[in-house]
């Protein structure tokens, strides 16, 4: 009886050892795969203008955009989209929000929820989404 149990134990140990080796080989092969950097870096630029009672500063605008995205979809989507106000012209109240390809729709959906800055009512109106910063700057009248 003990010899049968010993044989079964040895077979199970060998089986687990083989599975462990196969798993570690597969894991090491996956570590060498490089992600497609073009997909990771794909950015979208949202050209927008602001309708407000008074002038709005760029820092306040970025804070409100991030808070509206956080309120609408939570911290997970805030970290995924990572919206940043790249350029903002205070004279014409036009600007560009930079985000990635995955999260630009979430940023667009959250813009109407940005309703006030420092007690002043605002409305952020997206004009166009582009894939290049050069074209976005051209749309707001910069070089």
Curated annotation (Swiss-Prot):
Molecular function, one GO term: ribonuclease P activity
Subcellular location(s) per record: Cytoplasm
Record flagged with keyword Cytoplasm: yes
Predominant subcellular localization, coarse grouping: cytoplasm
GO cellular component: cytoplasm; ribonuclease P complex
Domain of life: Archaea
E.C. numbers: 3.1.26.5
Transmembrane regions listed in the UniProt entry: none
Family per record: Belongs to the eukaryotic/archaeal RNase P protein component 2 family.
Subunit record text: Consists of a catalytic RNA component and at least 4-5 protein subunits.
HAMAP family per record: RNase_P_2
Protein name from the UniProt record: Ribonuclease P protein component 2
Gene it is expressed from: rnp2
């Amino acid at each position: 009886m003990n010899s049968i149990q010993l044989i079964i134990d040895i077979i199970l140990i060998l089986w687990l050892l083989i599975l462990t080796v196969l798993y570690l080989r597969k894991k090491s092969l996956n570590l060498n795969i490089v992600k497609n950097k073009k997909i990771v870096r794909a950015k979208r630029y949202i050209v927008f203008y602001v309708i407000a009672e008074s002038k709005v500063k760029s820092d306040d605008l970025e804070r409100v955009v991030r808070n509206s995205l956080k309120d609408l979809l939570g911290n997970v989507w805030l970290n995924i989209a990572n919206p940043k106000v790249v350029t903002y012209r205070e004279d014409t109240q036009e600007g560009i929000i930079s985000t990635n390809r995955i999260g630009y729709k979430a940023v667009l959906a959250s813009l109407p929820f940005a309703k006030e800055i420092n007690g002043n009512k605002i409305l952020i109106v997206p004009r166009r989404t582009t894939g290049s910063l050069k074209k976005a700057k051209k749309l707001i009248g910069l070089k």
